[in-house]
Curated annotation (Swiss-Prot):
Note: Deletion of the DNA-binding and the C-terminal transcription activation domains causes no visible phenotype, excepting slightly darker coat pigmentation and a decreased proportion of auchene and zigzag hairs. The mild phenotype is due to functional redundancy with other Sox genes. The phenotype apparently depends on the genetic context: backcrossing the mutant into a pure C57BL/6 background leads to defective lymphangiogenesis and the same embryonic lethality as observed for opossum mutants.
Protein name: Transcription factor SOX-18
Subunit note: Interacts (via C-terminus) with MEF2C (via MADS box).
Domain Sox C-terminal: start-end pairs: 256-376
The entry's DNA-binding region: 79-147
UniProt xrefs under InterPro entries: HMG_box_dom, HMG_box_dom_sf, Sox7/17/18_central, Sox_C, SRY-related_HMG-box_TF-like
Job of this protein: Transcriptional activator that binds to the consensus sequence 5'-AACAAAG-3' in the promoter of target genes and plays an essential role in embryonic cardiovascular development and lymphangiogenesis. Activates transcription of PROX1 and other genes coding for lymphatic endothelial markers. Plays an essential role in triggering the differentiation of lymph vessels, but is not required for the maintenance of differentiated lymphatic endothelial cells. Plays an important role in postnatal angiogenesis, where it is functionally redundant with SOX17.
Free-text tissue specificity from the UniProt record: Detected in adult lung, heart and skeletal muscles.
Region (Disordered): 1-76
Region (Important for transcriptional activation): 160-225
Cytoplasm as UniProt keyword: no
Bias type Low complexity, positions: 21-34, 41-52
Length: 377
């Protein structure tokens, strides 16, 4: 065995290790245990070649995939697809271009080969097409049950989609956009004549279908309804007063203070007819003709009601309100729809405003008792 020079490895080993290399007692202890003793020279440490080396570990196939040898075996066992005409032509052409341009990258060579193949005419491609057909027939004979299996399987990405029926708690998704509720829909229809909102109101605990959907909501939860519209649509909002009392409680919001005061003091029939058709009885800005208002006695009709004053004396006016008033908080009588205010068109209501206010207060009390019983039940 060839020995290393005396100064080999002296600078690599720490001083403590060099001092312990020739310490006495190590060989004696080894002889007492029956182990072979190697003579270590104090001047020449053990060479790295004399140390035992463990064999190289191959990566585990189950944990790290195939090793180098196993990968080669798998590639040899895998049946390759037959080459097409371009592959047959590019097999030799790639070698020629690589020898001419050794500095070019393989991707650049592939682009050059693709351009050169497209520039060839049919006569120049024919021999390669025939060779590719021969290889295909030979491959079919050698492997009759061959089925192409790509190496990498394309994994379809799973896109999580939120189903339209699933909504977060506290959120209401209207089935129609807010534009469907605007005044430009074609006619002044009431809320119940608009397209239905689907099953969004099923969980709001509505007691009866006759009630307005807004009654089951809190004042702050009606945000999905359209915002205040243009001034020309104020008449339509006043017509829908029982379904949106917060918009039509004060007529000055739409018409201004002078006109609102005139509406409060004017006879009931004329302003209500004006509210139905538009401001001051003029037709609204709708392209389609409006349906006529409910039949009601005009100012001349009040004179015809005088002979029937004895009939109105036996009628309880609050009985009509508990069926016709559909809101919890009853708005002013000037903003009620035509058929609701019509129940109070009598000689007493028109002649005695104090009695009318008393009847209105009694009507509010009866309505509160009626709807509190409905909600609690």
């Amino acid at each position: 065995m060839q020995r290393s020079p005396p100064g080999y490895g002296a600078q690599d080993d720490p001083p403590s290790r060099r001092d312990c290399a020739w310490a006495p007692g190590i060989g004696a202890a080894a002889e007492a245990r029956g182990l072979p003793v190697t003579n270590v020279s104090p001047t020449s440490p053990a060479s790295p070649s004399s140390l035992p080396r463990s064999p190289p570990r191959s990566p585990e196939s189950g944990r790290y995939g195939f090793g180098r040898g196993e990968r080669q075996t798998a590639d040899e066992l895998r049946i390759r697809r037959p080459m097409n005409a371009f592959m047959v032509w590019a097999k030799d052409e790639r070698k020629r271009l690589a020898q001419q341009n050794p500095d070019l990258h393989n991707a650049v060579l592939s682009k050059m080969l693709g351009k050169a193949w497209k520039e060839l005419n049919t006569a120049e491609k024919r021999p390669f097409v025939e060779e590719a057909e021969r290889l295909r027939v030979q491959h079919l004979r050698d492997h009759p049950n061959y089925k192409y299996r790509p190496r990498r399987k394309k994994q379809a990405r799973k896109v999580r989609r939120l189903e339209p029926g699933l909504l977060l708690p506290g959120l209401v998704q209207p089935s129609a956009p807010p534009e469907a509720f605007a005044a430009a829909s074609g006619s002044a229809r009431s809320f119940r004549e608009l397209p239905t909102l689907g099953a969004e109101f099923d969980g709001l605990g509505l007691p009866t279908p006759e009630r307005s959907p807004l009654d089951g909501l809190e004042p702050g939860e009606a945000s999905f309804f359209p915002p205040p519209l243009a001034p020309e649509d104020c008449a339509l909002r006043a017509f829908r007063a029982p379904y949106a009392p917060e918009l039509a409680r004060d007529p000055s919001f739409c018409y201004g203070a002078p006109l609102a005061e005139a509406l409060r003091t004017a006879p009931p029939a004329a302003p209500l007819a004006g509210l139905y058709y538009g401001t001051l009885g003029t037709p609204g800005p709708f392209p389609n003709p409006l349906s006529p208002p409910p039949e009601s006695p005009s100012l001349e009709g009040t004179e015809q009601l005088e002979p029937t004053a004895d009939l109105w004396a036996d009628v309880d006016l609050t009985e009509f309100d508990q069926y016709l008033n559909c809101s919890r908080t009853r708005p002013d009588a000037t903003t009620l729809p035509y058929h609701v205010a019509l129940a109070k068109l009598g000689p007493r209501a028109m002649s005695c405003p104090e009695e009318s206010s008393l009847i209105s207060a009694l009507s509010d009390a009866s309505s509160a008792v009626y709807y509190s019983a409905c909600i609690s039940g």
